[in-house]
Design a protein with these regions (language model features):
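Small-residue hinge/turn detector
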Residues: 13-14
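Solvent-exposed alpha-helical segments within well-ordered globular domains of core cellular machineries
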Residues: 4, 8, 18, 22, ...
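The Walker A/P-loop phosphate-binding site
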Residues: 7-10, 20-130
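Phosphate-binding/switch region of NTP-binding enzymes
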Residues: 189-281
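Conserved catalytic network of the ASCE P-loop NTPase/AAA+ motor domain
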Residues: 61-63, 93-99, 124-131, 155-161, ...
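Amphipathic alpha-helical transducer elements in NTP-driven molecular machines
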Residues: 48-52, 56, 65, 80-81, ...
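Flexible glycine-/small-residue-rich
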Residues: 73, 107, 139, 170, ...
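Conserved inter-motif catalytic segment of the P-loop NTP-binding fold
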Residues: 98-184
Length: 281
């Protein structure tokens, strides 16, 4: 935390805040690490299966802990359905594509459906009632409420809750409705930036996978190709570790295009959204 953030949170003076931060830094080993040490840390990363082998392969094994994975696309492209699948799969053992933990869902659009969780759980060999017990969800009614929930999640994990997946569906809904017009764009992006950094800190500190869904808009000045573009601007584009564009395909299928990833090539895969969750074509 910065001195300003500590002052705002605790009420101490900035001088005291600086002293606290310097003391904490002196007690931490904040030196550089070798590439081999960093590689060993990467070996502890867990990847949660999407339910589709083709989709998992596109993402390098699944949704990664310690990272933010963003899926954006038009209405009905499968973003929320993937979230439901992940909320079940995170409960599975690691050898079955899970993380042996629970999911926490921040719902800004009222799209979570517990009955879908039950159907996916049954198809995955889990007890539907137990799957719902191993799940926490909350409705966010504005952007401040949404941001406050991230602080609450950090507190829950610190107190021992085995949360391994945080789902925000959707990230931008409240930000778009509360900050309208170009005159408020700078304020919106600044607030969004703070929110994203809290999500990143949560992912890195607690080795949690963060899955966010995002809305899209059409670029009016684009006459050729797909005019669809994710909302949120460069602030969101840079914060997401993995970014996928989802769209409808032929005969009810969905197409996922990997747009950005640290060490993976761009690519596409096809998957299905069924009554029992995400499946291969």
């Amino acid at each position: 935390a910065s001195p300003g953030e500590l002052t705002e949170a605790s009420g101490v003076s900035e001088a005291v805040a600086r002293k606290i931060i310097n003391t904490a830094r002196s007690r931490l080993d904040m030196g550089f690490e070798s590439g081999l040490d960093l590689l060993k840390k990467r070996e502890s990363v867990v990847r949660i299966s999407t339910g589709s082998k083709a989709f998992d392969a596109l993402l390098g094994g699944g949704i990664e802990t310690g990272a933010i994975t963003e899926m954006y696309g038009a209405y009905g492209s499968g973003k929320t359905s993937i979230g439901h699948q992940l909320a079940v799969n995170v409960q599975l053992s690691k050898d079955k594509g899970g993380a042996e933990g629970i999911a926490l869902w921040i719902d800004s659009e009222g799209t979570f459906r517990p009955e879908f969780i039950q159907r996916i759980a049954k198809a995955s060999g889990l007890d539907p009632e137990e799957a719902l017990k191993n799940f926490k969800g909350a409705r966010a009614f504005n952007s401040d409420h949404q941001m406050l929930m991230i602080e609450k999640i950090d507190e829950l994990i610190t107190n021992g809750a085995p949360i391994k997946l945080v789902i925000v569906d959707s990230l931008m809904s409240h930000f778009r409705s509360e900050f309208s017009g170009r005159g408020q764009l700078a304020d919106r992006q600044q607030k969004l930036n703070r929110h994203l950094h809290e999500l990143l800190k949560l992912a890195h500190t607690h080795s949690v996978a963060v899955y966010i869904t995002n809305q899209v808009m059409a670029k009016p000045d684009m006459f050729f190709g797909d005019p669809t573009e994710a909302v949120g601007g460069h602030v969101l584009h840079h914060a997401s570790t993995y970014r996928c564009y989802l769209r409808r395909g032929k005969k009810g299928s969905r197409v996922a295009k990997l747009v950005d990833a640290p060490a993976l090539p761009d690519g596409e895969c096809i998957f299905m959204v069924t009554d029992d969750g995400i499946k291969d074509l």
